Design a protein with these regions (language model features):
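Active-site clefts of carbohydrate-active enzymes
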Residues: 201, 233-236
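Positively charged, amphipathic and often flexible ligand-engagement surfaces
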Residues: 193-208
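Catalytic alpha-helical scaffold of carbohydrate-active enzymes acting on polysaccharides/glycoconjugates
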Residues: 1-147, 152-192, 210-231, 239-303
């Protein structure tokens, strides 16, 4: 039986307040586990409009109807409306995920600021952002986070090292084909990376005739084999208009015989000694604008 680890990125105040409760209900109906990764500071979603000048961004917006999924109010945060503090205004919604038995971790402090800046920032800036997120998580939950999953799959060397410094055993900060030990400047880090292996729904919708009505079928076609996977979903999407597609995925994965686990559940079944050691790299992913953290394909016998 293969395991599919479900990783929920929660980017916005609306996603935290509205999407998370809906996802909890869907997951509980399916007896599925998942890891919720929270944005813990200000919601500056409106600042993301600056990405309109990046190659591929407008095409993605047109394919996935950002306004319908995020709402006008969210798109005004940081532009025409002040940015709300998610960790202050929606702490109870975050704790509800933990109280329902779901693994919780850090997504970021400020989603837009992290995604748009971390690649070129230094260790001091990175440490400051991550410390803000860590401290707020501890304030909200009364305990340290279990794991980390970077906003927009954007990282730098200092961020990977900070995960080691926190003592986290595993994280999910990039894209790839399977678990690996990340290597920075020739040195293997202590934690295991569990990269997202499957395309997200918004990467598939609008391509090759795929829409919200058949996207679940398209994705299920990629999970027929008995192979572990990591799937990233978003509270704003699968916890909103794409909820029917997500429910169809949950049913389909059960029918395929897969176990639906959280990141911790996937990590628990790994033999660290058999994992490849791979350098951190950047690359493009179909349906996603810009470059992301990617794991090079492991060569046979790589360690």
């Amino acid at each position: 039986m293969a395991r599919i680890a479900l990783k929920v990125d929660v980017d916005t105040l609306r996603g935290t307040r509205e999407g998370v409760p809906r996802l909890l209900a869907s997951l509980e109906r399916a007896s599925a586990k998942a890891t919720f990764l929270f944005s813990l500071g200000p919601d500056h979603t409106g600042w993301a409009l600056r990405r309109a000048f990046r190659p591929g961004f407008l095409a993605k917006v047109q394919r996935t109807s950002v306004l319908a999924h995020y709402g006008l109010r969210t798109l005004m945060y940081g532009v025409l409306l002040p940015a709300p503090d998610i960790g202050r205004e929606a702490a109870s919604a975050m704790r509800a995920a933990r109280d329902a038995g779901f693994e919780c971790g850090i997504h970021c402090w400020d989603h837009v600021v992290w995604q748009d800046n971390v690649r070129r920032r230094d260790a001091a800036w990175t440490g400051s952002q991550m410390t803000l997120a860590f401290d707020r998580f501890a304030e909200v939950f009364g305990a340290p986070p279990a794991t980390h999953g970077a906003a927009g799959w954007q990282m730098n060397a200092a961020a990977f090292r900070r995960i080691d410094a926190w003592g986290m055993a595993y994280a999910s900060d990039g894209r790839g084909t399977g678990p690996y030990l990340p290597q920075i400047e020739g040195v293997a880090l202590a934690h295991v990376q569990l990269p997202t292996t499957l395309p997200t729904l918004d990467e598939l919708i609008g391509t090759d005739g795929i829409d919200a009505g058949n996207v679940a079928t398209a994705l299920l076609g990629l999970t027929e084999a008995d192979r572990d996977q990591v799937f990233t979903l978003h509270a704003e999407l699968e916890g909103g208009l794409l909820a029917p597609a997500f429910d169809a995925l949950l049913s389909g994965w059960r029918a395929q015989g897969h176990a639906l686990v959280d990141l911790g559940g996937l990590f628990a079944g790994l033999d660290r000694r058999r994992l490849p050691t791979l350098p951190i790299a950047w690359g493009e992913v179909p349906g996603r604008s810009g470059e992301l953290i990617v794991a090079p394909v492991a060569r046979a016998g790589a360690r």
